[in-house]
Amino acid sequence: MKTHRTAADAGDIVFRSPTGRWMLAATVLGSAMGFLDATVVNVALPAIGRDVGADVSELQWVLDSYLLTLAALILLGGSLADRYGRRRVFTLGVVCFMIPSVLCAVAPTAGILIVARALQGVGAALLTPGSLAIIQSTYRSADRPAAIGTWSALTGVASALGPIIGGWLIDAFSWRWIFLLNVPIGLVVIAITGRHVPESRDPHVTGRLDLRGAVLATAGLAGITYALIEGPRGGSPLWVTATALGVGLAALAGFAVTERHAAGPILPPGVFASGQFLSANAVTFVVYAALGGVFFLLVVFLQTSLGYSPLAAGAASLPVTLLMLALSSRAGALAQRVGPRLPLTVGPLLLAAGMLLMLRIDVGAGRGVADYAVFVLPAVLVFGLGLATTVAPVTATALAAAPATHSGVASGVNNAVSRVAQLTAVAALPVLAGIGGKDFQDPGALADGFHTAMLITAALSAAGGLLAAATIRSDVLAGAPEPARAAPARRQPAPEAEPCPYECPVAGTPLRPAPAPAKPRQGGTPGPDRPGGTDGTHEAPGPGGRGGADGTDEA
């Protein structure tokens, strides 16, 4: 049964209402499918390699094929969500993720598994930006901080639980079950979404889809991503890599020109008008490149060099899960009180410290409980503290700096940046650290490469903290009045209200004083899920603008 809610209800949902809780469950579970799959496969790599006879290059492509299609299409996915409906595209993404998951589970060869993973990336490109866009466009402004903080904590926990769940499934059954797990989760998400999530879209997007922009964006991201994968490892001839890079750069240049003149651009130029949006995405790229390297190598290192079982290797990161669950929402609240600059400086520096502590883990460390407590636990505790301090503030900063009506596109851009960063790390880090050939099966060689890799990732993470200190403003997440909201779908857009001086925050409690009380509703009674609006209408969020009438670049 589909929900009776329409776009008219969007933007008025109360977080603690039954509908608000169901919507959060749908977006968290949907996002968890993508986040879980991104981390659970790392634990399965040794088992996959043994079962299908894959070498190091093929195992890297098991990861990279997913990231390649995800990075290439995620911008288009965000644009489709804003244009055709966030609930519709989110649901389609869940379906397109489930079906290839079954193909992954039955893949008899590495080649088929790589293709199936690429198809999974297509589904993830549709559902990933849609989840945050649903939160930003359906909850009332005052409740978005609580919603985004809880979403960040629970999806972070899903990422951290991936290695544990994957390790248990591999030990108890087979690596193939890590993909079958997506089927029941997906069915639950589809049922909840159809019944409880209202539809919303950007009412200002009109006319046909910008097909030329879509093709250029996809070709550009795919070409550059392929070059980033194959360039460092030398898996393809130099001319092939150079051609892919050239085509990618040319396509993105053409995309930039096309979007300036398109009637309904996939990537509205105004999204990049905020310097804080650019800075937040730059910090995202640097920090997530470091995280991608650690998540890729740590569980493999623990299994190969220290003799951990898949379950034990996954459970080794359990403190990260607990810290994410306990501290992510508090990190968002801290960012609201003191500004995001402090947590985005301290968090990456703590991550770097945790990576340096991983240098103490060596082949002779042992795998007993006492050995874990002495060598592994201190590193993952500091690392987890840094992760919990960083994730919610950097996501909130990126989304709060972009216009509210472009929430799907802004989420797509930020997700694309983080995925390309992780992909770059997976491709380049083994080469830079001297890991190649059969080193993933040699305990001593892998340990040497792992230590070199941790030095590189620590330097990257520290650089991200310094970049945040230099470029992120403390008032980015400042509070704001409710943004002007466009009329619901199937109606003519209603006149917009006065542009608010600051965009509404995405995480945490507003720093600035609350706006003046709204005028009473001119008819109608607020329901349990939707408080009274300022004009008696139930409208989807419209543009918060890029600052006030004075043109200042406020968030």
Where are these regions (language model features)?
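12-transmembrane solute porter fold
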Residues: R21-V43, V56, P237-A244, A251, ...
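Glycine/proline-centered helix-kink
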Residues: P129, T150, T155-G167, L221, ...
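Membrane-helix interface residues
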Residues: Y84-G85, Y139-A142, A172-F173, L209, ...
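Intrinsic disorder in cytosolic terminal tails and internal cytosolic loops
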Residues: M1-T19, T471-A555
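Transmembrane-helix bundle of Major Facilitator Superfamily
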Residues: K2-R195, L344, A352, L356-L359
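Interfacial helix-cap and linker-helix signal at transmembrane-aqueous boundaries
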Residues: I48-G49, L80-A81, I165-F173, L228, ...
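Hydrophobic transmembrane-helix bundles of small-molecule transporters
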Residues: D171-T284, A290, Y308, T457-A458, ...
